[in-house]
Amino acid sequence: MDWRTSYSSSFLLKTVNPATWRDEGDLQLTGGSISRTVGGASADITMTEDPGEQWVRLYLVARQSGDGGRVPLFTGLTSAPTENINGTAKSYRVECHSVLKPAEDILLPRGYYAAEGANGALLAAELLRICPAPVTYAGNAPDLTEAVIAEDGESNASMAKRIVEAIGWQIRIAGDGSVRISAPPAAESAKFDVFEGDAIEPALTHTYDWYSCPNCLRVVSGESTAEARDDDPNSALSTVMRGREIWKQEKSVTLGDRETLAAYAQRRLKELQAPSRTVNYRRRYDPDVFPGDLVRLHYPGVGIQGLYRVGNQSVTIGKACTTQEDATYERN
């Protein structure tokens, strides 16, 4: 299928056996939406009967010129529904939790910590494996450069997310519920082009954010650190012009050929001082794009071109499976 052009859509809701992670029975739904973030997913669906608490998987069934397929959109755990009565008809609004819900409900023992030098991805995966969903991680994970100490009331899930953030990686939850821990993708997952099967609706919001740009940066690589400052009175974002220091720290460092840590710090500060540019738009659903992915946008008529990192997504369970998302500019 060509997901950049129009297709018809219907939806299928199945129960899932947590022991095998396979589909079993059928359930009826009438609509709803899915919310996705980096490392998270939830759904709000309307059903014709009370499902109780059980694992479910929602599919998009797409058709296009005789071709088609079934794509998993969301897998999660149903919660207590809200019953709505209209005359003699009943419907149930059901909130569905992420596949990480079991790990969110387990508290770590007091004093737990992830030690400096440990494999961060391995530790995070072990914390999440209390969930029935399959959890995997990439094999080239960096080690923790400093210990991550659990806070009071820390859960398996929140600790796993803190460890993953500490190594500069991310958690991706696929539509089938599988969990993958890896570095943020460096290659584009899709291209949305006004000249080639335009999938984006005309309404876009383009936002520039300079307020959070740092003027001081500390970079950490192993036992070494370097700092860079912008004290230039001619720079609009400098400590002089803004009258205050705005710090940022980076622990995931990739040096260029013959580049020193100090030179890297200076270069990264300049890059981070470029005001963030965020677009928000609606488009047809594409199964290859999730929060944290890169997409290439080519809309030169409105000044939107380059690679953008997808943030939050909202997927409508309805006509065209419309997806609304925000994405922040990274590079050309």
Per-region residue spans from a language model:
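Extracellular/virion structural assembly segments
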Residues: 22-58, 102-103, 107, 114-118, ...
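Oligomerization/assembly interface segments of phage tail-like spikes and tubes
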Residues: 31-50, 89-102, 219, 251, ...
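Amphipathic, non-transmembrane alpha-helical segments in extracytoplasmic/periplasmic proteins
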Residues: 41, 45, 96, 109-136, ...
